[in-house]
Amino acid sequence: MQMKVTSEQAKQLLTDQLSVWKSARDNYKALEAVQVKELTVEGCTVKIQFNPARIVSSAAKVDTQSLKERKCFLCAENRPEVQEGLPDGSYTWLINPFPIFPEHFTIPVNKHLPQLIEKRFGDMLRLAQAAEHYVLFYNGPKCGASAPDHAHFQAGNKGF
């Protein structure tokens, strides 16, 4: 089992996947139409992004009944046939087919476990250290994410 996916390996996965996965490629292409505005708030500059294509993911139904009625798309057996991943210990790096970054990855745990950060800080640090060109982040189960029922992190390229 491969451990410690590097930034270079992740970038190659993205390139390989976009060459064969049309809908993901189209969604990455749609990033060109994203509107970005920079604001400075109390001396801190932030970028605000308007990405209408992202509504598919951000407006997904995540109520208890909807989650029961759908197959978890982060579980290996339910992923699209075209989706490949890079094993990384008990996680797998996948490209995010609904990106907000020019290089956007979802890193689910290989078992269907709840999206809880407790006991995963060490994992998060290890993943972040190995893939130094990416910022790693966690969305909690109540933040509007489309996968509140499966433990995962996300990664995106720094400085975009």
For each feature predicted by the language model, list its residue ranges.
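Glycine- and acidic-residue-rich phosphate-binding/metal-coordinating active-site segment common to enzymes
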Residues: Q129, G140-F160
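Active-site microenvironments that recognize anionic phosphate/pyrophosphate groups
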Residues: M1-K119, D123, Y134, Y138-P141, ...
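Extended, Lys/Arg-enriched charged tracts that mediate electrostatic binding to polyanionic substrates
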Residues: R126
